[in-house]
Amino acid sequence: MSPNGWIILDKPLGLGSTQAVGAVKRVCREAGLGKVKVGHGGTLDPLATGVLPIALGEATKLCGRMLDASKVYRFTTCYGIETDTLDLEGKVIREVDSVVGIVDDAAVEDVLARFIGPIEQTPPAFSAIKVDGQRAYDLARAGAEVTLNSRTVTIHALDYVESWWQEGKLYATLEAHVSKGTYIRSLARDLAHAMGTFGHVTMLRRLKAGPFGIEQAISLDKLNEVGKGAPLENVLLPLEAGLVDIPALNLGPEQARAIRQGRVLAGLPHTDGLYWAKAGTVPVALVELFGGTATVVRGFNLPDVAE
């Protein structure tokens, strides 16, 4: 039986999100599971580590929902230097000799409150955004001048963690809870500019993506154990683990049959909103309730659904 559910990978440094998906596919083949549909719920740059939700089977139908979810990151900024990529990988384009007397711990903490809530943010030139059909990072690497439009994103929370001095540069680690579409590299740049200096990201770790936290994440070594004979169940979370942030709608056998056939259910005594409908413990579909009527948003083809 083909697996359906989530593997939450603690993505290591240097591994791309597409490579991580490839690693899961390889492990499934090695485990004798055959060809498994696999997708990820939110790109994480190779220079970033942490939570990368990887969907298997029917859970891939929820990848789009995961992309729209908010994220939590911990990141370190080096103040006094800005690079073209806004991280360690790039070429230095702006620099000051020292930030002593310009930036200190208090300045970092003081500026955070100004960035809470909806803000306008310009994405990095080195990003996956498409410009006239081409990725911005491809154009930037080719030497083209890339100008991206600003966008409105939301910073739900921004907290100071720690800071230290090294060779005349201040390093500060912050934790940010952000909406979809937020670039942490741009946030670090803009925070530095607000302090009157420059900055680039030296460490980026995703602690949470949607309902999934770092405490649920497994290492690449743990994943590889599945390819060597360990049970997939050791690392696979159920499909409904990606739905814990919305309420469940319990269905009887006839209701489950109707939903699986794409029909609407009327006369339900529930408030309007998004629900995941289930028959027993088995997810049947995502449904939208309005005026007591449930309409299928996305159906799941899972075994043991009441017929």
Please identify what each model-predicted range represents.
Residues 126-127, 131-156:
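Extended alpha-helical targeting/anchoring segments
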Residues 65-123:
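Acidic, low-complexity central loop/insert segments
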Residues 152-172:
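Helix-hairpin-helix/helix-loop-helix acidic hairpins
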Residues 37-67, 138, 142:
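Glycine/acidic-rich beta-strand-loop module
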Residues 54, 75, 133, 187, ...:
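Residue-level signal for inorganic ion chemistry
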Residues 128, 135, 170-211:
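Pseudouridine synthase
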Residues 1-47, 69, 171, 194-307:
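Accessory RNA 3′-end/elbow-binding domains used by RNA modification enzymes
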